[in-house]
Regions:
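Non-catalytic all-alpha helical scaffold/repeat segments
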Residues: 1-287
Length: 287
């Protein structure tokens, strides 16, 4: 309707999305239709800003009905933030990130950014540097905001795997630095969907061998059966690279590699130990 008769929508926004007491069911019905089936465009945001705020702050949605609506509301705001409709000092970000109780919105917001930037079809679409800077600034703002109670946000922090997977934040090693910081945080003890990280970890291996090794070794030793690398050779390729190269600026990397191999073998089940020994012992400095 905004596309067909925009003047009518502008004039009737408050009637379409009423926020007065007693009209909650009307708002729920119209917001449900808009946020799930409507289109987001920059021209809409100015007149819908307070409606987004109401949808976030009002106790409108029950657990079953509301999860998808809450997710899509947060995703809509992530879209508008990326295009510069509002900034880090906006009250809207506070409504999402000021409390760990908004985990549904937080996960959806952070996940949507990484997923939407992923060039999964290989079309080579370029993303404006201004957009990328807005997102890196957002992440750094979020990390600073939760630094004293970050364990309350583990499910949100794990969504950085999408940001790393999308491959848009490589300049200056920003993405690998952020991922390394998360994975190496022993208070968080994060596990991640390793298959999302594999391709970019291999791309980063030559330039950032220590950080890639740290990430892979921590995730392998920390992960459970469902959370290992789907490409079995990523561990082998990393170990082989370290064994076959010298690292004068990191003289402990080779010995750390050997320690990792030994720990990995120690953690192996009896039925898989022989196979793993054949795979990995050849990468020890003294096999």
């Amino acid at each position: 309707m905004d596309y067909a008769i925009p003047e009518w929508v502008v004039a009737n926004t408050n009637n379409i999305f009423p926020t007065e007491k007693g009209k909650e069911e009307i708002f729920k019905a119209t917001w449900h239709a808009f946020i799930l089936y409507g289109r987001q465009c920059n021209s809409l945001f100015e007149r819908l800003e307070t409606k987004f705020a109401y949808a976030l702050s009002a106790d409108l949605w029950d657990a079953d009905e509301g999860k998808r609506i809450r997710e899509r509301t947060a995703q809509g705001l992530a879209y508008y933030y990326g295009w510069g409709a509002f900034t880090l000092d906006s009250f809207l970000l506070g409504l999402i990130f000021n409390s760990a109780a908004k985990q549904i919105e937080q996960v959806a917001f952070i996940n949507y950014i990484g997923f939407s930037l992923w060039d999964r079809d290989g079309r080579g679409d370029e993303i404006s540097n201004d957009v990328l800077v807005r997102f890196t600034s957002l992440w750094e703002w979020f990390i600073e905001k939760i630094k004293d109670h970050r364990t309350d946000y583990k499910k949100v922090l794990v969504e950085f795997e999408r940001w790393y997977q999308c491959g848009r934040f490589k300049d200056g090693g920003w993405a690998i630095n952020q991922l390394h910081s998360l994975v190496m945080d022993d208070e968080l003890k994060l596990t991640m969907s390793c298959f999302m990280l594999e391709d970019n970890l291999l791309e980063d291996l030559q330039q950032y061998p220590r950080k890639v090794f740290d990430i892979i070794s921590r995730l392998v030793l920390r992960g459970d059966r469902s959370d290992t690398f789907s490409k079995n050779d990523i561990v082998e390729k990393t170990l082989e690279f370290i064994k076959n190269n010298d690292f004068p600026d990191d003289i402990l990397l080779k010995s750390d590699k050997d320690s990792f191999i030994n720990k990995m073998l120690e953690q192996s089940e009896a039925w898989e130990l022989e196979q793993k020994e054949k795979l990995y012992r050849k990468y020890l400095e003294i096999s």
